[in-house]
Amino acid sequence: MKKCLFLIFVLALGSGLAAQKQLSDVFEKGDVVWFGLDFSQAKFVQILNEQGSETEIVEKWIPAWNNLMVSEPGKYDFAKTFKKEQVIYAIETAARVNEQMVPEGLLVSSCPDMEAPEALVADLIKAYDTGSVTEGLGLVFVVTCFNKGTVQGSMYITFFDIASREVLLCEKMTGRAAGFGIRNYWAGSIYDVLKQIQKKDFKRWRSKYLSK
């Protein structure tokens, strides 16, 4: 009986270890869970007209940008960008984070540089409520700035192991905004980032991380 119990324990432990994702899984085919656009650290420069408000950003535009990623998967193609077989959408995680944002102070004259951004992103991931998604490879974009003055959106592309919340890859990217209307214009910066990654950066990251 003791031998049986020990065998069950070993098998369960082995199964748990196998479920955890490693850095190499970022570059392998398979599934990825898209947790959305995390705006909890974001600042905005001149993105609204005179009638716009910071509350509008939190209540209207941030949900609109997240929903667009889901409603137009052919354009915002995470599977093609990151060479994955399937994308599982779980943007409720980012929605819960974004709903806690305080509107005051979001509109600024210039976006400040983040101190120790990788450590900050790691702390954000640790606190995520991923709901029923308990394992697998997670992906989130932590947006830091939408800047009309520079016509750019900046964000940290972040892969993590869902089971342990360990960050596997965190890379800063900047995309050029383009399009008509506030929603499409700033979503254009995300689209530009995806195209950059498809063209060269995913291959560059593979060489950077897997050659160590």
PLM region descriptions:
Residues M1-S24:
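Bacterial Sec-dependent N-terminal signal peptides
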Residues F6, V70, G74, K83-V87, ...:
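Generic surface-pattern signal
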Residues L7, F35, V140:
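Residues in well-ordered beta-strands of folded domains
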Residues V10-A12, V26, V70, T134:
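Compositionally biased, low-complexity repeat tracts
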Residues A19-V108, L210-K212:
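A structural "domain/chain start" motif
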Residues Q20-N49, C111-T134, F146-K212:
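C-terminal/domain-edge helix-coil "capping" segments
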Residues K84-G136, V140:
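Surface-exposed, polar helix/loop patches in the mature regions of secreted/periplasmic/lumenal proteins
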Residues V143:
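Active-site nucleophile-His-acid catalytic modules used for acyl/amide transfer and hydrolysis
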